[in-house]
Every structure is written in structure tokens, then in C-alpha cells.
Amino acid sequence: MISLGMDSHDVLRAAVLHGGWLAWPVAALLLIGLWRCRQRKTRVALAGLCAATLLFLWARFAEPNLIVVRHTVLHGTGGTARIVLIADPHLGMFKGADFLRRVVARINPLQADAVLIAGDLTYEPQGQSLDTLFAPLAALKPPTYAVLGNHDEQKPGPEIDLALRAALRAQGVAVIEGRTTQVHGFELAGLGDRWAGKDDAGFLARIPSNQPLLVLAHNPDSADRLRPREYLLLLAGHTHGGQLRIPWLYRQVLPVHHGFDRGEQWYAGPRGRIRVYTTSGLGESGLPVRLFDPPVIDLLELRP
């Protein structure tokens, strides 16, 4: 129910979330009108409206429910490993345990050495059990590690970070913010969320400089916290790849300061260059739509 206190974004979100179904009869009426119409100008107008409506239906109901596996080989990492990187499932308002169960079913056959979750696991899950939402993670076969993102840390979002950490632990997921662990010959370190002011990387100084290092963070902008080293790869999410990947326009709304988008990029900072891989993520925030940017599981083949 839309209250008078809702702002324009809330009204738009409610309209897309709950009123989007009305686009189906609208599309049907437009197609019927296009078939019956004989006037050229009217047919062109109807065709344009029909195409726009069908594109909306795809972005609202089809693309957000796709799950694509993107396979990337990264050379020069200092070691060999098969890593699954996911981020931004945003369980809560738009997606739930059923979607996560499908994600797990796609990950398990990939025979990964580890699964890394780069934050934003939730999106306003008020009144929903976190244990129930994240129960499918218990079925993951590889060891699984996570950090939290801004929506998990009230930036913005409800105060759920402690409960979320407990729910993840209960499913066998290790939250590794501010600490390191070994993954198939790599040192894996986790950074807390940047918007929450928790991405201090000072603890990485104790890792030997010749040790291949993977850093898991939510926000790729955390690259500016790192010191260059021979073998270093930052793995992140947060950008959604634009979510609505309309050429040029999506770049104007990417929530980053250092120009990160998706895939492999390099951050050129005052200390030197940092290698970054950003996943497009699995879920949606703001509006329950994706366009030209389907939910993705990144399978990274790391090579020396």
C-alpha cells in the first residue's frame, strides 16, 4: 500500500513491483491494435509502444530470473585455483530463498575450489527470517567465504548485520572481514564495507610480499586502500554492472568513484596499479529490473 509519506522513488518502485503485471494486458491490446490497424503512422506508433512494453516485460519478469555463468581466465595471479565469485543477491524485497537455491544448484557442478560472496546479501528483508532466506547456502559443496556490503550495514538498510553474520555462520559460510585464510595456495583476505567505513587494509601488511593474495571486498573503490604487490587481485561487486545497462546512461549512475564497471580492470592510484575484478552480481536494488545485464555467477580460472 502506498502511503502519502512515500517519496517519488518509493512510488516508482511500488508501481514497478506491484503494477508491472498490468503491462501484460497492455502488450496484448497493443499487439491486437497493431494487427488490426491499417494506417501507416498509427502502426508505427503502435509498434514503438509495443516494443517498449515488451522490453519492460523482459526487464521486469524475464532477465532478473536468468542465471548466467561467466567463465574468465586470469593469468599472472601467482597461483592456480578455480574460484566462483558472486555478489549482490539482495535477498528480501525482490528475491528469496528459491532464487538462491537455483544459484547454489548452478554453482555446485562447477567444481570450484572456493565460493566467494562479495557482499550485499540482503535488500530490506523486514519481517523475513534470515536463517530461512540463506538456508540454501548450506548445500554449497566448496568452502564459502563472504564479506558484507552497504545494504547489509545500514548504508542504507535495516540494522541486520549481526543477525546476518549469525545466519551465514549457521550455514557454514565464513565471514572473513579483517582477517585472512588460505585458499588453494592463495592468501584470501576480507575487507569490510567501504560505505560503513570498515575497509581498512592495514592488516594486510603482515602478509609476505611474494605470497599470492586475493582480497574480497564489496566495493571495488576499496582498491585505493591497497598497496601494489607482485600478485594481488581484488574481487568485488556493488556496481550491478549498471543493472539497467543502457549504453552511456548506465555509466552515469554507477555507484563508484574510480570508474569501475564489471569484469577485469586496473585501478591506477598514487601508490601504483591494482588489479580488480568486479562481478555484475545476482540481484537488484532500487527497482526489480535488469536489462542487458543478467544475474551472473563468475567462474574465475586463476593462472600463474
Model-identified regions with their sequence ranges:
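Non-catalytic terminal accessory segments
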Residues: 1-68
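Active-site metal-binding loops of divalent metal-dependent hydrolases
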Residues: 87-91, 119-121, 150-152, 179-180, ...
